[in-house]
Amino acid sequence: MSFSHYSFKPNFVIQNSLAQTVFGSFFLGDTTLPNRKIHKVTVDECSKLVLFELLSGDPDASIVLLAHGMGGSSESAYIKRIALKLWIRGFSVFMMNHRGSGLGMGLSKYLWNGGVSDDLEKIIDYILGLYPKKFIDVVGFSLSGNILLKYLGEKKSEPAKIRKALAVNPPIDLKRASLILSKTKKGRLFNNYFMKSIHLQGKALADSFPGVLAPSGNEKTILDFDIHYTAPAAKFNDVNDYYSNCSAKNYLKDITVPTTILSALDDPFVESNIFKSVRMSSAINLNSPDQGGHMGYISSNLTPWGDFRWMDFKVVDWSGEDRE
């Protein structure tokens, strides 16, 4: 089944992008997972990432790695829903937690940001160390989509690590996305949601690593947070240096791994014209439904899974391509 099959049509009562984005986080459905194996991956002398594995029971099962968005973790409903559907389809599924996220709170001396492609590489290498004869497919959601695309552009000479990649609603221009979230009326609703999660992560960091640079807890917006914590903690000269070096738009031209970008034209955080204004390699397939919001994609029709979660369906469908 091709990725273009079952084109997205929004639910008739959830038409606009903000509603799609909000409702995409509601009606969570069954997110109960079978037993998971936990891995703690050391990424530096004071930092560990928590990685969960859903075993398929099939030694020949293909591997899919899922990476969450900002404010999320392996426990986010969309990660668990998609992981379960992939597992039912027979995949071996890994769900990573970035620094300071989920069960990884307090296990790293600084929090993750939109440019931690080195961490993603270490997770990929760890998984392939467990299963050296297998290939891996990687799905990055939202901010992890930016990280994934950055990684692929940086590692253009190492395509054998990843068979293919999918970035879902990636904010490839971090500065622009930050300004939208921090400065616009439509963005502030979501900004406040993200900041609550970030402040919890910051408190866990300060409690576990006294004396290290930690968020003050007074940051009101994503932009404030990036200025006062993200950039200095990651040793960038300033926030513009962080945005410039970590925005995936600067790496798309160098990607050699077959890559799909799924991003709705009405995404409230990721402006659609950004993809037309940057150079993209021929390895990238851009899939841009007219509607869907930011990781919403609540469909008007039932998917083959019996729900209205078009994003879930597309990720699982994409994972199964070339394997039938």
Residue ranges, per PLM feature:
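N-terminal cap/lid segment of alpha/beta-hydrolase-fold proteins
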Residues: 17-58
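Short beta-strand/loop motif that positions the catalytic acidic residue
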Residues: 255, 261-263
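Catalytic active-site module of serine/aspartate enzymes centered on a nucleophile-bearing elbow/loop
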Residues: 292-324
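Short amphipathic alpha-helix adjacent to the substrate-entry channel of hydrolases
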Residues: 78-95
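Catalytic nucleophile-loop/oxyanion-hole region of alpha/beta-hydrolase
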Residues: 83-85, 99-137, 306
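Catalytic histidine neighborhood in serine/cysteine hydrolases
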Residues: 280-297
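Short beta-strand element of the alpha/beta-hydrolase
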Residues: 61-69
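Alpha/beta-hydrolase-fold enzymes
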Residues: 129-133, 137-233
